[in-house]
Amino acid sequence: FLKGVFQRITLKDVVVGKNYVLIISTCSGLWSYNIGDTIMFVNLNPYKIIITGRVKHYISAFGEHVISKEVETALEMCLMRFGGEVFSFTVCPNINPENGLPHHDWFIEFIKKPANFSSFCEYLDTSLRKQNIYYNDLVKNNIIRPLVVNCVKVGSFNNYMKSIGKLGGQNKCPLLSNDRKIGDFLSNYLI
């Protein structure tokens, strides 16, 4: 979908474990609407889906096509292994860093930071590499370096949401962004 290849399929053609963009249409197919969610089928009899993210929330600055489900799974695996508690996080590309290769910047507001933070960061990268083969290839071939975790002060994400007029329970900060707008704002709150 991100590459501009649009192929409609019916339920009889879906595969368990593959991400799809959910399109709602009339029974005649005369019109259709992209609701903006990505889904994955977890069962075909009966049909069961999980929402894996939003179409507009992805990172593909280097061709990696990282989606919300992949970063959430990687972070959950790290928290289960190393402990800690996260209030919120977001990931964005750093295309032109001052030093070294481009990379993904993770901005995390911890409620409780893991005790072994350096191992946490290494395992986070390893977990994401297991989730996404394109990201793994880019890191393995030194096109980009492993991800960088930036800890931000308590209240940083609320400050960002307030700055864009969306503070409140009905709004969430995007987990992924293909630009630096959120990352640049949160860079002012680094610990």
Question: Which residue stretches match the model-derived regions?
Answer:
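Active-site glycine/GP-rich loop and adjacent strand/helix microenvironment
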Residues: F1-I191
